[in-house]
């Protein structure tokens, strides 16, 4: 028996979910896309074998960024394009988190306070790396928002892939070898200050909304108590790993860029009421265990992580900012004496891409091994 998928879970439990909850327009769109992905609802490419006449139908995917069936190719294409941005230099992985007491307010103001996470994280890196006490150079970094923990609970945090060196004001290359050059205590202090300053400014200018468990923070005294608690709490950014070299960086990036709240391979079992899936227990050094929750709760948790409309989740800063990226990276390569790594997939058609990535030849007939002609009929539809 095949393992259940996210699509299967939505088919079984989404009607019951709707009796209890009201999804946002973006959540409803994600559900509609997931339910119809690769079913024929979005059309199909129909190919005919030139030798035996056999017909093969390939159903189109939904391409929704929350769909677990639609992330593999976009991830590979994005990773391939980023090859040209990677230098032969150390890289570090930083994670910025906020106290979980802020979660209700953040969820009520997702776009606003997700943006605040990016602003605070990027401003922290820029301030500390430009300080001669730490590095005194302009670095490049990519920030990626994740909003989930292993159990699909709401846990907004920023993953940052940081170049371990940069250009000084005199356009000289400077790094600190493989040693991480920013004190964690300094990152924590500066990040907390910048995030809280922006949060308080949003409150003072009446830009925040409060729903659900965040309703109480409409009250000035309750909000002030929340702010005080945040200053008292530990803000724990951390550096996860040091790595070097193009392939290491690209592979590492791919683990985070197109990840969604849960992938199909983590789902173990589904019955008429519950869903069982694997989670990491970080209290036991990341050991895997099984968690069983109701199907309705599974959908509620999954939909918490549908991003706001047109929200940009992967953002580039510093040397990787598109306005000056080519010029600055070229200078860095010249100073480091390293070559530019070229894209392997650019300008290639999908059959070539699939063959190169997965050794799948979609131009070969499954019936006779003959050659499939180009799709003769396309049936584009939108649900």
Where are these regions (language model features)?
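Beta->alpha loop/short-helix hinge microenvironment recognizer with preference
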Residues: 1-383
């Amino acid at each position: 028996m095949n393992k259940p998928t996210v699509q299967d879970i939505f088919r079984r439990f989404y009607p019951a979910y709707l009796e209890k909850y009201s999804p946002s327009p973006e959540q409803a769109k994600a559900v509609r896309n997931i339910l119809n992905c690769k079913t024929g609802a979005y059309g199909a490419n129909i190919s005919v074998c030139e030798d035996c006449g056999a017909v093969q139908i390939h159903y189109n995917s939904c391409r929704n960024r929350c769909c677990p069936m639609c992330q593999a190719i976009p991830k590979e294409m994005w990773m391939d394009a980023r090859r040209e941005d990677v230098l032969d230099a150390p890289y570090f992985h930083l994670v910025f988190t906020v106290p979980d007491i802020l979660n209700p307010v953040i969820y009520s103001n997702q776009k606003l306070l997700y943006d605040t996470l990016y602003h605070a994280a990027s401003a922290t890196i820029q301030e500390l790396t430009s300080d001669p006490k730490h590095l005194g150079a302009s670095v490049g970094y990519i920030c990626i928002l994740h909003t989930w923990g292993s159990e699909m609970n709401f846990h907004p945090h920023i993953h940052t892939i940081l170049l371990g060196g940069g250009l000084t004001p005199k356009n000289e290359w400077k790094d600190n070898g493989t040693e991480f050059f920013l004190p964690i205590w300094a990152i924590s202090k500066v990040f907390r200050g910048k995030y809280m300053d922006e949060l308080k400014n949003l409150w003072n200018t009446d830009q925040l909304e409060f729903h659900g468990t965040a309703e109480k923070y409409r009250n000035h005294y309750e909000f002030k108590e929340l702010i005080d608690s945040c200053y008292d709490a530990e803000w724990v950014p951390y550096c996860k790993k040091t790595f070097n070299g193009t392939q290491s960086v690209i592979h590492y990036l791919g683990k985070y860029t197109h990840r969604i709240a849960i992938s199909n391979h983590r789902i173990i079992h589904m019955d008429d009421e519950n869903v069982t899936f694997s989670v990491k227990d970080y209290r036991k050094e990341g050991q895997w265990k099984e968690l069983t929750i109701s199907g309705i709760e599974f959908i509620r948790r999954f939909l918490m992580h549908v991003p706001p409309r047109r929200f940009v989740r992967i953002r580039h800063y510093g040397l990787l900012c598109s306005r000056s990226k080519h010029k600055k990276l070229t200078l860095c390569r010249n100073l480091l004496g390293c070559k530019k790594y070229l894209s392997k997939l650019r300008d290639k058609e999908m059959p070539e891409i699939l063959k190169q990535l997965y050794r799948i030849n979609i131009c070969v007939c499954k019936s006779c091994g003959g050659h499939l002609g180009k799709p003769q009929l396309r049936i584009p539809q939108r649900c």
